[in-house]
Amino acid sequence: MDRAVSQVALENDEREAKNTWRLIFRIAILLLTVVTLATSVASLVYSMGASTPSDLVGIPTRISRAEEKITSALGSNQDVVDRIYKQVALESPLALLNTETTIMNAITSLSYQINGAANNSGWGAPIHDPDFIGGIGKELIVDDASDVTSFYPSAFQEHHNFIPAPTTGSGCIRIPSFDMSATHYCYTHNIISSGCRDHSHSYQYLALGVLRTSATGRIFFSTLRSINLDDTQNRKSCSVSATPLGCDMLCSKVTETEEEDYNSAVPTLMVHGRLGFDGQYHEKDLDVTTLFEDWVANYPGVGGGSFIDSRVWFSVYGGLKPNSPSDTVQEEKYVIYKRYNDTCPDEQDYQIRMAKSSYKPGRFGGKRIQQAILSIKVSTSLGEDPVLTVPPNTVTLMGAEGRILTVGTSHFLYQRGSSYFSPALLYPMTVSNKTATLHSPYTFNAFTRPGSIPCQASARCPNSCVTGVYTDPYPLIFYRNHTLRGVFGTMLDGEQARLNPASAVFDSTSRSRITRVSSSSTKAAYTTSTCFKVVKTNKTYCLSIAEISNTLFGEFRIVPLLVEILKNDGVREARSG
């Protein structure tokens, strides 16, 4: 019994001893853990300088500043990336394309000469200075958003005058014609020694040149070849065009007054000539008895022609033989164009009757005055394969002087406002199979011409007239889809008299601030305008060749007026220069 009790007591003592050692072990482990943790914290604070709560207050600010620095750096890098992309993906290919176009134009000119042995003098095809590569015959201002009339001309700039002037009081220099290609320009005018009203004899000045920039950056027109066609041939109403073989020119040959010519029974003689790069001039008479079989009078449009699809295209106009096939097909055809926000109050039937009569003015014996387009193949043989297109009078007004223009991939016909419609007209033109098709025109309501009553500048109703003056517009501003938005030109800002020449930029309804040649009483006549860009500086310029009154030496002096196109948002019309 006692043994059993002793055994139980021994087991209890052993169990208590084990529990005691377990407690001591646990306490020791806990203390060791606390010491280790404290040591670790102390080491961390010592070795890493751990922040206290007060130190953490400025951390968000520092993080924000760091973010700004990183964002700024990334933004700067993005600007660099954007500039690189613009240069590599957009500007460089465009510059290369423009350079390629100009080189190909020059090569084309050379190939024409080489293949046809057209130039035996050793003179090569000329070309403008590199600063103009890609800036001629292009859509110069492409802008979908800006107000067209926020673009305006500067004051006229001094530059080298490449146009000869009269040298006597009775001398008459008139009817300028100008065209410029990617490689060279062509210019011509008519010279009469005994006053502007003499129709019996005149001679023609014809010149070929290139655009240059001087050492100081000034633009000048450099004449390389010129000729005075002073012979027994009386060339009139000449139009010129820059082609790969030089300067092609279309003229009529006349010895009678315009009224007498329209009253004759045979077409007017016409000649296709060319001033080559070697300075030699050659010409050939066209077979007008076949080409103008249905015509009694036929004249070039005075304005420049255009080289399109290996052919040179000229505007022509004249009188049709009554009851001829060409005359009969136009019978009962007419078109009425309306002024912007200024409707004709006449009855519609009366308007139609007057519109039909406008094609047969009494001045020319009631002949139908018709618009047409003549294209000739450009080769070493002059007058080759001429094709005449006569557009329907459901599109064109009474025939008048005109100009063919090419800007970018678009072609246009300007028609002088000789009939009742005063605002400037530009007909879009498409070409195919040697013929042309005209479409409904762009009209520029503020770009008017003076005229005799009832066809004065403010006229709004159809009437029979032969009036107006040649003042062509040049396509300047386009939408990105290549639709025309605005033009540049020098108008005569008078109601009836040929007075007050003024340059401006025009949209369909209004005009920009203007640059006047002189006072509002300044007499003037024909103007023809062409725009181009100096690619190096990205500056756009426009040249207006204008007939300005010159009382001391001759009745007129032809002056090349040069302006830069500037931009000023919100500015409408003001005086400049």
UniProtKB/Swiss-Prot annotation:
Alphabetized GO MF terms: exo-alpha-sialidase activity; host cell surface receptor binding
Pfam families found in the cross-reference section: HN (PF00423)
Superkingdom, taxonomy of origin: Viruses
TM region positions: 27-47
Region (Important for interaction with fusion/F protein): 124-152
Ranges of the Intravirion topological domain: 1-26
Sequence ranges on the Virion surface membrane side: 48-577
Keyword Glycoprotein: yes
Protein purpose: Mediates the viral entry into the host cell together with fusion/F protein. Attaches the virus to sialic acid-containing cell receptors and thereby initiates infection. Binding of HN protein to the receptor induces a conformational change that allows the F protein to trigger virion/cell membranes fusion. Neuraminidase activity ensures the efficient spread of the virus by dissociating the mature virions from the neuraminic acid containing glycoproteins.
Protein name as catalogued: Hemagglutinin-neuraminidase
Protein encoded by which gene: HN
